[in-house]
């Protein structure tokens, strides 16, 4: 199994390190043809407007949508969720539009208002998961086929739709590998 990490901007290194700790071969995806070389893909946190602009400049956006629609498993964190969302409230931004959610960018505040909390994620076990929110998006609406795996103060923060796993927080910034392991099970 080989997992790609989109390498255009953001928390690339942190995801690669998490995957290496799990003994997984990785590829930093920087070219459209790299998408044909991976069994699953992680879209890291970062700055979503920069990421979509770079994807378009590299002509990778259409290929990525095609691969996801063909069943490529994807794990998106923070800005990656914004990239995948079908709808973004109160902000005009291009997106890939493959995940049936509506999001609000930076909904939990600015960088200085970032926070950590523990959340319950029954799908990965009974122990709470340390969730780090940094200028995180808020999922304000989910489509019928979207399964909500975790909440924070009533808002969905971890969702799954088909082969897409989407987290508004940053699991790659913790030592807890359970979400990465959960994603690898989706890829198998």
Swiss-Prot record:
Pathway: Cofactor biosynthesis; pyridoxal 5'-phosphate biosynthesis
Statement: the UniProt record of this protein carries the keyword Lyase: yes
Known catalytic reactions: aldehydo-D-ribose 5-phosphate + D-glyceraldehyde 3-phosphate + L-glutamine = pyridoxal 5'-phosphate + L-glutamate + phosphate + 3 H2O + H(+); L-glutamine + H2O = L-glutamate + NH4(+)
EC numbers, comma separated: 4.3.3.6, 3.5.1.2
One cellular-component annotation, GO: cytosol
Active site: 78 (nucleophile), 170 (charge relay system), 172 (charge relay system)
InterPro entries: Class_I_gatase-like (IPR029062), PdxT/SNO (IPR002161), PdxT/SNO_CS (IPR021196)
Any GO molecular function: pyridoxal 5'-phosphate synthase (glutamine hydrolysing) activity
Record CDD domains: GATase1_PB
Binding, L-glutamine: 46-48, 105, 134-135
Xref: SUPFAM superfamilies: Class I glutamine amidotransferase-like (SSF52317)
UniProt subunit comment: In the presence of PdxS, forms a dodecamer of heterodimers. Only shows activity in the heterodimer.
Protein name: Pyridoxal 5'-phosphate synthase subunit PdxT
């Amino acid at each position: 199994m080989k997992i790609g990490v989109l390498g255009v901007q953001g928390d690339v290194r942190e995801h690669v390190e998490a995957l290496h700790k799990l003994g997984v071969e990785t590829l930093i995806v920087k070219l459209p043809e790299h998408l044909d070389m991976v069994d699953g893909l992680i879209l890291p946190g970062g700055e979503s407007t920069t990421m979509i602009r770079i994807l378009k400049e590299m002509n990778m956006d259409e290929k990525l949508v095609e691969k996801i629609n063909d069943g490529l498993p994807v794990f998106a964190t923070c800005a990656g969720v914004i990239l995948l969302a079908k709808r973004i409230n109160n902000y005009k931004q291009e997106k890939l539009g493959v995940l049936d959610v509506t999001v609000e960018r930076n909904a939990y505040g600015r960088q200085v208002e970032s926070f950590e909390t523990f959340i319950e994620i029954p799908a990965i076990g009974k122990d709470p998961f340390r969730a780090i929110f940094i200028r995180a998006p808020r999922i304000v609406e989910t489509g019928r086929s979207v399964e909500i795996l975790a909440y924070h103060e009533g808002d969905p923060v971890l969702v799954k739709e088909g082969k897409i796993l989407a987290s508004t927080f940053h699991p790659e910034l913790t030592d807890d590998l359970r979400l990465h392991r959960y994603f690898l099970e989706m890829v198998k």
